[in-house]
Each structure stands twice: as C-alpha cells, then as structure tokens.
C-alpha cells in the first residue's frame, strides 16, 4: 500500500484518542500477524505513537508500556507512569500532520540523510504551541528520579583533556576513545547555540545533560553506536525521562516501517520494546554524577547503580549487514546512522 493511500488512514486515527488498551490490542495483533501484518495495522500503531509524541506527551509512558505488553506478552516490571491531571489529548496545529507526513515520505524515498532527518524532525517542534512545551516539562516529573535530578545546577562542560587523564579501562577513558576514534563531538551539539538554558525546568537540565551524557549512556547501558542501537537508545532515553524528541522521532520510524515490508516492522518493534523495557527497569541514570565516576571501571559503575547491559534481541550491526536485503533496512540505515549527531535537535 502506498503513502497516498495510508495517509488518510493515519490522519483519521491519530485524531481519535487512543486508550492504553487500544495500543496493547494493536501491538498484540501486529505480533500475532508477524510478517503478514498489513500496512493498515502498522500505520495504526504509528498513529498511536505520534499522538503521544505530539498531542499527549504525558501519555508516552502508558502508551509504550501498553505497546510493550501487547508485543511482548507481559507487563513491564516497574511502577506505572502516571499521567497529568486534567490534561486531555491536545488538538494538532493546522499543518502539523502534513509536515510530519512529508518527513515520512521523504525518508521513504531516501531523500534524507542523518543531518536532514534530524533537522526535519526538530522543525516539527516549531508547530507546537508554548503550552505543549510546558506540558512536556510537567510530564518529565512523572518519571522516577527526575524531580531530584533536575534540582542540580546545569553541568559544566566536559573536556577531552580531562578524559585523557582517566586510567586505562575506566569509563572516562572508554568515553575519550569513543569520541576520538569516531571523530564525534564531545557533547553532541552546542548547548549554548541551542539555548537550552532558557528552556523551562526541568527541560533545561535534562536536555543539557543528555546531550553531554548520551555516549556515556551508550557505554554504561550497553548500547553500541550502530543504526539499530541508536533506535534502541532512543526508546531507552524515552523510558528514563520521557525524552520528547525521541518520541517524535520513533513515531516517524514506525510510519516508515508501515510503508515497507512487514519483516522490518518486526525488527523495529522488537528493538523499541526491548529497549523501552530496559529503560523502565533500569534505575534513573539522570541521578548519576558522571563527573565523579569517570575514573572508575565500567563494571563497578554498573554494579553500584544496578545497571544491566541492554539485552539485545539482534546483533547490533544488523542493519549495516542487512542493508542490501530489505528496503526497510536500507531506509533505516540512512535515517538513523548517528542521527543524534546530525544537526540541530529539538530542545524538548
């Protein structure tokens, strides 16, 4: 089924409120159908993900818990994430869904590289009113540990000079080598250029810290820097503190998978749900004072904070190796290979 046929189905469904039971049923139906799942079934789940990301950010937790339960067959072993009181599903600004769908279509056509997909997804945030940003900020407090973490001052910049002093085998030395060997930017993006300090609390702290600690999370939580694991760590981050950019990004991913062979959707949902559950069942990493842990071995840090490595359902480099096998893999590789470094990211 082509994009023009699926778009009206998406538009009709995304404006109809999803209850958690609806999401669970949708995910369960997709799981049971496997590679025979229809494009209509897959776009319905993408609509649920988009609704949570853009219209009901406080419902991201219950939406993904329901998705994981429907897909995996059992509940997340963590306390439910509550929703905000008196916060109904919002109304989409005129033009939002047309812009969102154009990103999906261009991604499907292979027109977007890592920089472009980051910029286009970030630009969707420009459609959202100030009230939405305030709602995202309030929703962050629904996640364990976030209210406490956000009491801290904005963290100082890390430097390669400091990391170079860390002993061999330490987290800081691994972080240093990852940045240098791959010519990554140390803090991913320039926090000052993005104006992160002007965001409402706790988004100022959360967005500054995750840009700074993104690769520390990769190392500590056991995610590699491959295309598939960038998708996975997006779900992990979302489970940890409701990262709205990740929610928006994954909704686009789901829509792209609805327009490609169903076997790609199976890999995608296995990856998203396993990483979401991993994030939900991992203690809040936003509470870690990373600066004081840099000289310590990674295994000790994991043990002290009760952090288990990601239980990956597929080899981390699956997309890189399968790029010539499926249309979905080819599209996803161009979209997600180091997407978080591609350019200006949405500050929410």
Language model regions located:
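Acidic, carboxylate-rich catalytic segments that either coordinate divalent cations
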Residues: 280-348
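Core of folded catalytic or high-affinity ligand/protein-binding domains
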Residues: 47-309
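Charged, amphipathic alpha-helical stretches
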Residues: 1-42
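Context-gated lysine
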Residues: 7, 28-31, 36, 111, ...
């Amino acid at each position: 089924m082509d994009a023009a046929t699926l778009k009206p189905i998406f538009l009709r469904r995304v404006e109809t409120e999803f209850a958690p039971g609806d999401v669970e049923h949708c995910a369960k139906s997709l799981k049971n159908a496997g590679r025979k799942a229809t494009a209509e079934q897959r776009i319905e789940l993408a609509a649920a993900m988009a609704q949570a990301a853009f219209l009901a950010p406080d419902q991201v937790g219950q939406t993904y818990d329901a998705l994981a339960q429907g897909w995996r067959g059992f509940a997340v072993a963590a306390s439910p994430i509550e929703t905000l009181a008196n916060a109904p599903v919002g109304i989409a600004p005129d033009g939002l869904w047309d812009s969102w769908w154009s990103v999906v279509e261009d991604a499907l056509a292979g027109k977007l590289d890592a920089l472009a997909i980051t910029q286009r997804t970030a630009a969707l945030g420009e459609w959202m009113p100030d009230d939405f940003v305030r709602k995202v900020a309030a929703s962050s407090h629904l996640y364990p540990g976030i209210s406490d973490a956000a009491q801290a001052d904005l963290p100082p910049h890390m430097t390669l000079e400091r990391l170079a002093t860390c002993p061999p085998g330490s987290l800081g030395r691994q972080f240093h080598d990852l940045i240098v060997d791959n010519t990554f930017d140390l803090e991913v993006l320039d926090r000052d250029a993005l104006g992160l300090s002007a965001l409402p609390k706790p988004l100022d702290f959360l967005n500054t810290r995750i840009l700074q600690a993104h690769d520390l999370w990769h190392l500590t939580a056991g995610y590699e820097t491959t295309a598939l694991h960038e998708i996975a760590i997006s779900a992990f981050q979302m489970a940890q503190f409701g990262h709205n950019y990740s929610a928006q990004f994954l909704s686009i991913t789901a829509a792209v998978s609805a327009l490609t062979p169903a076997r790609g959707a199976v890999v995608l949902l296995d990856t998203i749900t396993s990483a979401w559950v991993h994030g939900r069942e991992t203690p809040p990493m936003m509470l870690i004072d990373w600066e004081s842990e840099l000289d310590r071995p990674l295994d000790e840090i994991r043990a002290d904070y009760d952090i288990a490595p990601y239980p990956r359902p597929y080899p981390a480099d699956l997309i890189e190796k399968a790029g010539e096998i499926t249309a979905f893999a080819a599209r996803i590789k161009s979209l997600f290979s180091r997407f978080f470094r591609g350019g200006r990211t949405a500050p929410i």
